[in-house]
Amino acid sequence: SLGPTLAVEDDMEPNRWTAELDQLAWERDIVFVVAAGNDGNQHPDSGLHRVQVPADMANAVSVGACDAPTPDRPWARAPYSSMGPGRPGSRIQPLGVQFGGVDDRLFNVLRSDGSFLEASGTSFSAPVVTHALADLAGRLPRINSSVLRAFAAHFAERHRAYKARQDELGFGRLPLSFADALDCGPDEAHVLFVDQIARGDILGYQLPVPGTFSSAAKISVTLAYASPVEPTQPTEYTSASLELTLRPHRNIFRFSPPRGSTEKPRNVDLTSTEARTLLTSGWTSSQEPVTKTLTSAASLNEADLRDSGKWETLRHHRVSFAAGEINDARLELRYFARRAGALDGSPTEVPFAILVSVSDPNTGGTLYDEIAAQFAALRPVQRVAGRVRLRSSRQNAWH
């Protein structure tokens, strides 16, 4: 919580605090948790209501304030909490919110003399989130900064008006603890992929949906990665883009009609009689199974892709499938880079984390067991209590 009263500006170069800390986060694999600022009650026309530097970082966790702690409901943005959008490369700012105190329910702060101080501000909500992420880091067998950012966005509690208030609340109210997220119920499974990708490579990851599963399914996917930054490029600040593609069914391909035909392309099961009939009639099939759109891009041109999050370092998607629409589904990841607005071909590697949740809305009670039986390579995270050293006048004690 640095305290500069400087709101993000789209057409200006990033503040030095923002650029330096972003580059440090990229080079040293550090996650900074930053208070979003306390000017959210400024008039929107002034622009002063937006998140304050360095909360506009692309590689950090920026935290706003809400008016009620978890699990109290209803909850909303605290009136003073600064709002998004952030700068290009990290438009969803703050990443999320947590209780920071409001006039009729202040935040209790313990003074060094043992007395309490009542206050409010994002400078109090940010340390609460820092504590939760630090505890999570001690529970996971393998972490990097991207893992922590992915968990924060993935398990945020969505507001009932999530889309309409995303500039206010980001991905939602952030957890006080991630311990429960490490325990899956019988109708769900959470799987974490931690890897790195070189420019030009394509990586594939099979989604943990068992072949015997014939029910409807809900899938949540969060991608987080660290990116080098270009401090002199206000609108092209992040240099790396990881393109995420979902292919839900191994046998569903795109069939195109013969040249000159007036018929439209169609998606057909490659193993079906219809597919064989089309092929003998001169139709051609795609080389890869069809994809499921994860973004809201209106088209494939660069402007629409950029607006839909192509260069954002943190993305969260939720998709639903009817029974039979998933078969050996996989995610594919491709890495692009740019420099000064043009595609860059110099070799680099980008570390990333993908967090996937699969749930059965019909509550059949067998999904987790089926996943564990089919995907033997997956290992459940062991619950470990973090050890904390307390300093006292007598001796150091571990608890």
Regions found by a protein language model. Name each.
Residues 138-218:
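C-terminal subdomain of the subtilisin-like protease fold in secreted/lumenal serine endopeptidases
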Residues 1, 27-29, 57-59, 86-93, ...:
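Subtilisin-like serine protease catalytic core
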Residues 6, 36-40, 66-69, 102, ...:
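Acidic, glycine-rich active-site loops and adjacent beta-strand->loop/helix elements
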Residues 237-252, 267, 277, 294-296, ...:
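C-terminal edge strands of extracellular/lumenal beta-sandwich accessory domains
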Residues 3, 33-35, 63, 97-99, ...:
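Generic beta-strand/beta-sheet core signal
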Residues 218-303:
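Extended low-complexity, serine/threonine- and proline-enriched intrinsically disordered segments
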Residues 1-55, 118-120, 124-126:
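Substrate-binding/access-modulating region of protease and related hydrolase catalytic domains
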Residues 49-134:
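Extracellular S/T/G-rich loop segment that most often corresponds to the catalytic His/Ser-adjacent loop
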